[in-house]
């Protein structure tokens, strides 16, 4: 999508933050006349940026013990969140893990 938008001066695209490297981010508002907010780690995690979402992983505690639980715990660890940041997403603050 980014390549298609780059070819058209009038195009607008929407995608995940990890896919937005090298593109111009624009401020958006929840309503007409409302404050336009630029996407950033701070505005996304605070909920101020109006078109962001969390990604969830659902597991069954009774069925997904062991390796799955270890993986989820690693994802929520500082090491796992470092990988999240390395691939272009915003890591969760410790109080949200």
Please tell me what each predicted stretch does.
Residues 1-97:
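Exported/periplasmic ABC-transporter solute-binding proteins
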């Amino acid at each position: 999508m980014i390549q298609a938008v780059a070819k058209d001066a009038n195009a607008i695209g929407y995608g995940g933050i990890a896919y937005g490297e090298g593109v111009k981010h624009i401020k958006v508002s929840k309503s007409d006349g409302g404050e336009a907010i630029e996407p950033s780690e701070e505005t996304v995690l605070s909920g101020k940026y109006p078109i962001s979402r969390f990604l969830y992983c659902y597991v069954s505690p009774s069925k997904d013990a062991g390796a799955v639980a270890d993986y989820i715990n690693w994802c929520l660890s500082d090491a796992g969140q470092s990988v999240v940041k390395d691939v272009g997403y915003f890591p969760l603050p410790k109080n949200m893990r």
